[in-house]
A protein has these predicted regions:
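Terminal accessory carbohydrate-recognition/targeting modules of carbohydrate-active enzymes
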Residues: 1-222, 259, 270-274
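Aromatic/His-enriched, Gly/Pro-containing loop or helix-boundary segments
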Residues: 84-87, 290-311, 317-324
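Well-ordered alpha-helical scaffold segments within catalytic/enzyme domains
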Residues: 262-274, 312-327, 372-384, 418-428, ...
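A generic secondary-structure signal for well-formed alpha-helical elements
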Residues: 106, 120-122, 205-207, 272-275, ...
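Extended glycan-interaction surfaces of carbohydrate-active proteins
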Residues: 71, 217-256, 279-304, 340-365, ...
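Short, solvent-exposed loop/turn segments at the edges of secondary structure
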Residues: 17, 93-95, 259, 307-310, ...
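Generic recognition of stable, solvent-exposed alpha-helical segments in well-folded globular domains
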Residues: 225, 229, 259, 263, ...
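Aromatic (Trp/Tyr) and acidic
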Residues: 6-37, 364, 368-372, 376, ...
């Protein structure tokens, strides 16, 4: 699905992706932060590109509207020339393709002198500035820039006329960045009818797979749009870098976080993406344990194991896939690994790292959602510990709400929505707790993380009041 916007473009960002890379930019044409540009996680390749036609830049003054979806199309008006700037990330391309459609507004023959400036910045995401030198090679219709073992190719089907010497440029998209401009690249077109110019930015390695296609339609128009936008958003985060996986978020969370992945799989399975879900669960299962995160580069790619909800979420997601489709032997092995990670105290409470919950900025021992997820997992997997965990969950129940954790200084959070969602609370109590959620957690943007009546509540607090899509879906 695509939609068209023409207002507040400077406040909106767009992302175009395939299984290999993503390009992020502002819809007003800008590359405004160090996270903008072309990335093949976890490496950056391009800080920005700029286009000038007959001496006029395609920028916030020229752009009239933007169509946004699986591609990004910017509509410009430049000195009597209509320009459509289309940015796509084809599945068979380890990079992006930019196509300019040029048309004279008065239908008279007109020359279009087009200049492309590219700010190349090949570096790891952990670096702001790399001091390695570039090697630049030119050939017919191409420019290749290499730094270390990574390279970026600028190619075109048109005659690519490179002029001027390469130069280093400092710029400040929020923070100081350095890039190299290989020279100015020129194209020329005589406009009698509509003409096109295309060029590509491609990296040194690629993933050329594609995601299975599904088509679902809702009779309710708004729900139909919401569902399709949600699926598109998830697909934008899928990569084939260290096996198939889902990055936690653009632009900076460039790893496969288990928690984010398994929650997302619940929706993907419901939407019918069975083979994709199987591949992702298999990718986690074939590791030594079920890791809390898979990094896309480095020697210790699964070193982080701090997610306390990784194992129960894996068990729940695997069960859901099995009921809807199938699971393979590797996923079965993953299920056994996950089961062994359950630890319970004498009161039937699940033990876990205080820093390992989704609210990882808070120290939360014996958290209610971990208890609830393990209870749901034991029921799905017919584990003997189910009865103990049911008794343990009763310790969280309070007269007017469910405790967030069993700490003495407990606060009212949205996390009790999880046992409510899984039907683990008796109906009479559930109604009472839902009334509190509706009164204290509901906002125009969704479900708050913390009750607005808490002394430390902050509407912009990461885990202390802001509304999340995750918490809203639970509620």
């Amino acid at each position: 699905m695509r939609y068209k916007v023409s207002e507040n473009l400077s406040d909106r960002n767009g992302v175009v992706t395939n299984l290999h890379c993503f390009l992020m930019r502002s819809l007003d044409t800008g590359f405004k932060t160090k996270w903008s540009g072309l990335w093949s996680p976890p490496y950056k390749y391009l800080d920005y590109y700029g286009i000038r036609i007959n001496g006029i830049w395609l920028d916030s003054d020229s752009v009239q509207a933007v169509e946004y979806g699986d591609q990004m199309t910017l509509h410009h008006d430049v000195g009597g020339i209509r320009v459509k700037e289309n940015i796509a990330a084809p599945s068979d391309t380890p990079g992006i393709e930019v196509t300019l459609e040029l048309e004279s507004k008065n239908k008279e023959k007109k020359a279009a002198h087009v200049m492309l400036e590219a700010g190349v910045d090949i570096r790891h995401k952990s670096q702001d500035i790399s001091h390695e030198d570039y090697n630049i090679e030119t050939g017919p219709n191409r420019v290749r820039l290499a730094r270390g073992r990574k390279n970026l190719m600028i190619t075109s089907e048109e005659e690519l006329n490179l002029k001027g010497d390469p130069y280093q440029r400092e710029h400040f998209p929020g923070e100081k960045q350095e890039c190299i401009v290989p020279g100015k690249i020129f194209f020329k077109k005589e406009l009698e009818n509509a003409e096109t110019i295309n060029f590509r930015f491609t990296t040194s390695e690629g993933s050329f797979g594609s995601i299975e296609k599904r088509n679902q339609n809702f009779e309710h128009d708004k729900l139909d749009r919401l569902f399709k936008y949600s699926i598109t958003s998830v697909k934008n985060l899928i990569y084939d870098k260290e096996g198939i996986g889902i990055n936690a978020g653009h632009p900076w969370f460039q790893s496969y976080w288990a928690r984010d992945t398994f929650w997302t799989l619940m929706g993907l399975i419901d939407a019918g993406y069975f083979e994709l879900s199987e591949d992702i669960l298999t990718n986690f299962a074939k590791r030594e344990n079920i890791p809390g995160k898979i990094n896309l580069e480095g020697e210790n790619r699964t070193e982080y194991s701090g997610e306390s909800d990784t194992s129960p979420l894996y068990l729940i997601a695997a069960d859901k896939l099995e009921r809807h489709f199938r699971i393979n032997d590797q996923i079965q092995d993953g299920i056994q690994k996950a089961k062994h990670n359950l630890e319970i105290d004498q009161k039937g409470v699940a033990l876990h790292s205080p820093e390992g919950t989704w609210m990882d900025t808070l120290n939360r021992e014996r958290a209610v959602e971990i208890q609830s997820l393990w209870l749901e997992a034991t029921e799905r997997q017919n584990m003997d510990e189910k009865g103990e965990l049911e008794k343990g969950l009763n310790l969280f129940k309070h007269e007017d709400y469910i405790k967030d954790s069993l700490r003495g200084d407990d606060i009212a959070t949205i996390n009790p929505a999880i046992p409510l969602m899984y039907g683990q609370i008796q109906e009479e109590d559930a109604r009472k707790y839902l009334e509190k959620i509706n009164a204290e957690f509901s906002s125009r943007y969704g479900a708050r993380t913390v009750s607005m009546l808490e002394p430390d509540y902050s509407s912009s607090g990461y885990h202390t009041g802001s509304s999340w899509g995750l918490t809203t879906a639970w509620s």
